[in-house]
Amino acid sequence: YWKAVGSSKLDAMTRSLEAEDVDGVIVFVRTKTLTVELAEKLEARGHRASPINGDMSQQLRERTIEHLKSNKIDIVVATDVAARGIDVARVSHVINYDIPYDTEAYVHRIGRTGRAGRAGNAILFVAPRERNMLRSIEKATRQTITPMDLPSREQVKERRIDQFKASIDKALEQSDLSIYSDLVEEVVTEREVAPDKAANA
């Protein structure tokens, strides 16, 4: 769990998402309004996210779950009621953005990850006034929920660099790069710039 003090929960969550190996993610919040607001904020930060709540039609909820299954989105922001019945094997993380009102809801939430024999991770944000609920959850699950440190900005930066290198390696393996070579040569000739500068751009 992370002590939700100081930096915002949104910043804490995005840093965790960027520093860890994540696949599909379900983020649990308490209100329908927050599902929409948080999904929009995650989208603005470059994540593929969609809300799912009780105000949405059954058809739209099912389509959102299908998008998560088929890798069209990576994050679903959900209320407890709307998340019932979600069974997606690729969910690697459940993030309890808002602590649940009762221990049973917590057990249902974390049961959404680690499906089909895969490893799963659950992260819980706990404000100081919510420590009693944390203790109740530990008692009900008979597990100690350990505190976590947020990834440093340096760790996030290193992770981004590694991901960028991996995307370059993938492009080198799969693509016909001759079109880009021709384009760089054209830019060098037309703009009279150094080849390495054109390639870096």
Region annotations inferred by a language model:
Residues 40-143:
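Conserved RecA-like helicase motor core of SF1/SF2 enzymes
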Residues 32, 57, 83, 152-153:
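Positions that flank functional sites
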Residues 1-43, 182-186:
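Conserved interdomain hinge at the start of the Helicase C-terminal
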Residues 118-201:
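Arginine-glycine-biased low-complexity disordered regions
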Residues 9, 34, 102, 130-133, ...:
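Short phosphate-engaging motifs
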Residues 29, 54, 80, 106, ...:
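Proline- and acidic/polar-enriched loop/turn elements at helix boundaries
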